[in-house]
Amino acid sequence: MTIVMIIVFCALMMLAVPVGYALIIAAGVAVLFNGYLPLSIVAQQIYDQTQSFPMLALPFFMLAGTLMLGGELGRQLLELASHAMQRWRGGPLSTTVVSSVVFGGVSGSAVANASALGSVLIPWQKKHGFPPALCAANNATSAVIDVLIPPSIPMILFSLVSGVSVANLFVAGILPGILMAASFVFVCWFVSVRRGYASQPSQTSRRQLATLALKSLPAVLLPVLIILFLRFGLATPTEVAVLSVVYSLALSLLYYRDLTWKRFCDNVVEAGMATGVVMLVIMGSAAVGWVLTFDQAPQQMADWVAANISSPIVIILMMNILMLIVGMPLDMPPAILLLGPIFVPLADTIGLDRVQLGLMMVINLGIGLYTPPIGTTLFISSSIAKSPLGETTRELWPFFAMAMTLLLAVSFIPALTLY
């Protein structure tokens, strides 16, 4: 059944069938191929997956993100980051990195981050004399920092398939997220110094910068509040997601006073459409996961690896390579939902903590978002910058090297995630 399902899924993907539908059809064909199982099992698995209580967190986190990024708040955050980094060599480039960290605590989506930030910052960076390809590469890679900063949609999905606490995953992502941001800022500085890009004179006084920081503080506090509420057990992930929406509405209505009824409706529709896409993938992955479990494929793989490969280091490296390969053609939600049930038993076999595995998977699949030839944020950023894909790829390698270094560190240094 598993082999038939994989063949059908690959064929449907080559025909450009949407991932969610491809997963459901592949699982259905596999069940029919068995000959003894009713097709209603697929429908039952799809329905059961939608009854998960933690699943309610997804639409609310997405709505909170669209509410906060759609108005004055987004402009304030961008203005703060640009003025704060302007004095640095490569400051306009570093602004993208810092903005990704700040926006990551609000949006929770790397693709949305790449589009929202790139459309504003890339034209501004080009006006400051930075080449379009470098601007695109910087935006494509920096957007992925988003998936490490709470609230992270990929981490919520991994918790669904692994049983790991969402709070533990959110906390574990903070240090790797900061390290990735710092390494990308270093790349921006190094490239600027090596190529002779001058720092930009700042027109902002310290008093004005402090004023901008105070205006943006309520938004920056959101990820901090999420961590505190989850870490100390004050609320469940779903309750925190609802509170995030209430917090976002309060800021937009009472603090920034820029929320209109039309924008609210547009934001609700936008969040609903994004949630629908993810939910379809989740439902399809539930059916595929049932077929894999019925065939005992994850356990058989874990047993085979344990019997034939004695070194945990080799196993972890193989897992990383497979995740990188899968992350190139597949978006993060389906990749996590497909690989999670396979790798969790394998991680348990070699004593790899599930939280550490979750961070490995998120970073790996995040790198896949900008890895040629099929990288979502790479294509988005190149399109915004009007840069040929080949030129953007050449500028990508210093950022890629830093991300791979962090990936290896997270894979083999548990203290980076288990603190």
From Swiss-Prot:
One Pfam family of this chain: DctM
Coiled coil: none
Transmembrane feature ranges: 5-25, 26-46, 53-73, 102-122, 144-164, 170-190, 210-230, 234-254, 274-294, 309-329, 332-352, 360-380, 396-416
Top-level taxon: Bacteria
Protein name: Uncharacterized protein y4mL
Membership in a protein family: Belongs to the YiaN/YgiK family.
UniProt GO cellular component terms: plasma membrane
Species: Sinorhizobium fredii (strain NBRC 101917 / NGR234)
Keywords, sorted A to Z: Cell inner membrane, Cell membrane, Membrane, Plasmid, Transmembrane, Transmembrane helix
Location relative to the cell: Cell inner membrane
Keyword Transmembrane helix: yes
Signal peptide: none
Topology in the lipid bilayer: Multi-pass membrane protein
GO molecular function, one term: transmembrane transporter activity
